[in-house]
Amino acid sequence: MATTERKPLLLDFEKPLAELANRIDQIRQLAEENGVDVSGEIRKLETRAMQLREEIFSTLSPSQRLQVARHPRRPSTLDYIQAISDEWMELHGDRCGGDDPALIGGVARLGGKPVVMLGHQKGRDTKDNIARNFGMATPGGYRKAMRLMEHANKFSMPILTFIDTPGALPTVVAERQGAGEAIAYNLREMFSLDVPIICTVIGEGGSGGALGIGVGDRLLMFEHSVYTVATPEACAAILWKDASKSPQAAVALKIVSHDLKNLGIIDQILPEPTGGAHSDPLTAATTLKQALLDNLDELDRLTSQERRQLRYDKFRKIGVFTEVAH
């Protein structure tokens, strides 16, 4: 995972932090030019900057957390795989003539154990994002994912999936190629796999595109990630015909980690470094690796039959069905 120092990309609610950082730089520069010792003042300002960062990121609204989840420098599936695995070999192709770059996967070792890792992959710049369809997988991508999961099941390797997509690719071509069928097939088959399955939402978890690799024994979620049936922008456009109402939609949709944990949809929230995972990718990767190892250790104690039953029960409990008397 790259750790090269780069100019930060600031979100709108981080502007007070940028102003404070500029003030510190100006004071430091003036002190150097005039030979004045202002180390005490700088320490106070740096302490204030740390406190302000913690205050801001501990009180983010759902729409602000969505901005963090979409941050261009947020660690991607490949970033995490390369950071946490001892060995990694990417496998290509859906065996139907396609190799979707928006959904990648392969075999790896985690803590010395062979596993299959797969997930959505966004790009780092405009050109890369276009090549990877902004992390929106094609039907072929979901078929490739299923091929890798069947490979894992055949060789008794746990499956680790990483979810980071606004949704499946919404094009006419994708519909003609069977997007709905490909996702539905994955949902059905993932319930029947014998090996442990751990799914982690590392960024955006959007709609059926997320569910296509999201059926597992455990569903983990980074603190500032989001998981939703539709993007807040799409929800606002559908309900109010006004995409500017997406902040209200984000609240109503319950897209953030603590709401989803309270609803019983996710199993564990992974804390992020103050400032988001992009501010300290290596710490975020360490947190993820430990959580995966701990959960794998627990799941390995169960039989395959117990895991399948618990997996089924977990999803059956989600949601509420109310019958209205006539």
Curated annotation (Swiss-Prot):
Keywords (A to Z) from UniProt: ATP-binding, Cytoplasm, Fatty acid biosynthesis, Fatty acid metabolism, Lipid biosynthesis, Lipid metabolism, Nucleotide-binding, Transferase
Subcellular location: Cytoplasm
Pfam families: ACCA
Keyword Lipid metabolism appears in the UniProt entry: yes
All residue ranges annotated as the CoA carboxyltransferase C-terminal domain in the record: 44-298
GO MF annotation: an example: carboxyl- or carbamoyltransferase activity
Assembly and interaction partners: Acetyl-CoA carboxylase is a heterohexamer composed of biotin carboxyl carrier protein (AccB), biotin carboxylase (AccC) and two subunits each of ACCase subunit alpha (AccA) and ACCase subunit beta (AccD).
Name of this protein: Acetyl-coenzyme A carboxylase carboxyl transferase subunit alpha
